[in-house]
Design a protein with these regions (language model features):
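A conserved regulatory-domain signal marking ACT and ACT-like small-molecule sensing domains
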Residues: 2-186
Length: 186
């Protein structure tokens, strides 16, 4: 018997953090016969944000699309849902990871995301946190992971350019480029 085609939904829930709220959401997802394929949770100020990639039959996805807004209203949550597709992607030949500590100021994160965008590096993850320091400007800590198509050829220039950007901004930064071996083409 053929497996039914899976359908996918990206769901984001944002609301005031409180004990048990994530369990309530995941219980609702399960009750609709959806599977959580991937998820991220973050506490930002007094709010939480929960992002999930759900899979299920067409009926299961339609069920969560129609019932979650009622549950979200009861829980005082803001939700965003969007259907999507999940197709196997060709592996990227390389990954780039950076970690930066720098005095916080406006536009710092933008300068690093621009560094990645201008080199056609596809940001896969970005995390940042501002840390208070007694009598000093707060410290901004940034971690970014990105996929890279051309790093096997341009690895040294990416590394050199990253260090030059850190020096220009007075940042302490580390970069790691991992080039994956590719299967030989027949």
């Amino acid at each position: 018997m053929q497996q039914p085609q899976a359908h996918y939904l990206v769901l984001t829930a944002v609301g005031t953090n409180r004990p048990g709220i994530v369990n309530t959401i995941t219980r609702h997802v399960s009750s609709c016969d959806c599977n959580i394929e991937d998820s991220r949770l973050a506490l930002l100020g007094g709010e939480f944000t929960f992002i999930m990639l759900l899979s299920g039959s067409w009926n299961a996805i339609a069920r969560i699309e129609s019932t979650l807004p009622v549950t979200a209203a009861e829980l005082n949550l803001m939700i965003v849902m969007k259907r999507t597709v999940c197709e196997p992607k060709a592996p990227y030949p390389a990954m780039v990871w950076v970690q930066v500590d720098v005095d916080d100021s406006p536009h710092i994160i933008e300068k690093f995301t621009d560094f990645f965008a201008s080199r056609n590096l596809d940001i896969a993850e970005l995390a940042s946190k501002t840390l208070a320091r007694a009598g000093q400007v707060p410290l901004l800590s940034i971690q970014i992971a990105a996929h890279c198509q051309n790093c096997a050829l341009e690895q040294h220039s990416v590394i050199d350019d990253f260090h030059a950007l850190c020096q220009k901004l007075g940042a302490q930064g580390n970069i790691n480029v991992a080039v994956h071996s590719q299967p030989e083409q027949p």
